[in-house]
Regions:
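PLP-dependent class I/II
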Residues: 2-6, 10, 20, 27-57, ...
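Extracytoplasmic catalytic/substrate-binding loops of multi-pass membrane glycan-assembly enzymes
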Residues: 13-15
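A short acidic, glycine-rich active-site loop
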Residues: 61-65
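Short beta-strand to alpha-helix junction loop
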Residues: 69-70
Length: 392
């Protein structure tokens, strides 16, 4: 018996891009100490008060079936947060709670694409994007951003791919590049969506991690409220990655359909986790800033290290917990550089090629270890790159 085409073709017959990460984990399992700069996992755990509230809610009995769209108070809090940050009036009817941002991405594409529909996404991309699109039986089509444009997508390139497409997925602040899309970029994207009648799915899980520029939700742009679904999550903003709690914000009629989808798939999110998420949101912006601050510090540390040499270049990262580094001067691909760095110095980074063709010749560094260790790893990475150019 064979598995379904839907499941067996999720990876598209190719790599999932995680070979270097898997090699690093094999080394760790064998007893080798490895500095991991690979995945976007905070080096702190979920704050004790949030866990205490989660425990209180669970012991208090919120362990049965919870409201499938999400508990009203949490949906209201997210709606108020979105209204305050974007100026777009938002109510609980525009919000559905999901088991994390990944589930929100899957649900959003299920809502707006039918089997065989073309779904666009920007390259470089978060590694799950094309598989998510295949998982809903859409046809994934990448639109390349360019290093020469600091990975700001060109509206003209999106328009060239948009004929007959149904949706476009964007992510700002961006994983893997750390790029924050400018207003000009987003206005161009919005114009393409209006011109070609595209649904826009905006992954905004890094919206609290802004180092330069501003976060603009495209749902707030003219004519976009009724054609945009926004994906949000507590994972990055509140260091709640394992709690698996996210949301979709969009038109009320689409949210009602997503509630039907959840009824037949996830059947909602545990009530005690939703209670803890509500508690976390009520801690306010000061808490979100506290969670984001280590990445701001480490970005500054990395930029200082990079300024002291001229082999490794930095993509302008205005947000998120990552840096994309240009290592083309070494003559190696991102993958070859990552493997070499791992074997020579036991430092694990992600090859740019893991995130699409546009990031070839780059590596992604996650700023997710303690400051002094991160600074030391960056110095070693740059010294390794310089050694390669000396050998050449």
């Amino acid at each position: 018996m064979q598995a379904s085409q839907r499941i067996s073709t999720i990876l598209g017959g190719g790599s999932d891009g995680w070979e270097v990460f898997n090699r690093a984990r094999q080394m760790i399992d064998a007893g080798t100490s490895v500095t991991e700069l690979t995945i976007g996992e905070h080096d702190i755990r979920t704050a004790a008060p949030i866990l205490q509230d989660m425990h209180r809610a669970a012991v208090g009995g919120h362990t049965g079936y919870a409201s499938i769209p999400g508990i009203a108070a949490l949906r209201d809090a997210i709606a108020a947060r979105v209204t305050a940050s974007t100026g777009v009036p938002t109510t609980r009817d525009n919000v559905m709670i999901t088991p994390g941002g990944q589930a929100a991405l899957f649900a959003s594409h299920t809502a707006v694409t039918d089997p065989g529909d073309t779904a666009l996404y920007i390259d470089p991309y978060y590694a799950t994007y094309p598989g998510t699109l295949r998982g809903v039986c859409a046809k994934p089509v990448a639109v390349q951003a360019h290093a020469s444009d600091a990975f700001q997508p060109r509206a003209s390139d999106i328009a060239a791919a948009a004929k007959g497409a149904k949706s476009l997925l964007i992510n700002s602040p961006n994983n893997p590049t750390g790029v924050v899309y400018t207003r000009e970029t987003l206005e161009g994207i919005a114009q393409v969506c209006r011109d070609h009648d595209l649904w826009l799915i905006s992954d905004e899980v890094y919206d609290t991690q802004i180092w330069e520029g501003e976060h603009i939700s495209p749902r707030a742009l003219e004519g976009m409220e009724e054609r945009t679904l926004v994906v949000g999550s507590m994972s990055k903003s509140h260091a709640m990655t394992g709690s698996r709690i996210g949301w979709v914000v969009g038109p009320a009629h689409v949210i009602s359909h997503l509630v039907n989808l959840a009824t037949h798939t996830t059947y909602g999110v545990a009530g005690f986790i939703q209670d803890a998420a509500l508690f976390a949101l009520e801690l306010g912006k000061e808490f979100e800033t506290e969670i984001a601050e280590p990445f701001r510090r480490r970005r500054d540390l990395a930029l200082a290290v990079l300024a002291s040499q001229n082999v490794v270049g930095a993509v302008p990262n205005g947000g998120a917990m990552y840096m994309m580094l240009d290592i083309t001067a070494t003559g190696l691909s991102g993958e070859a550089f990552a493997y070499g760095l791992l074997e020579a110095h036991h430092i694990a980074v992600m090859p740019g090629e893991s995130f699409g063709a546009a990031a070839a010749g780059h590596i992604r560094v996650a700023m997710t270890i303690e400051d002094s260790a991160f600074e030391a790893a960056m110095k070693t990475l740059c010294a390794y790159a310089e050694s390669l150019t000396t050998q050449a």
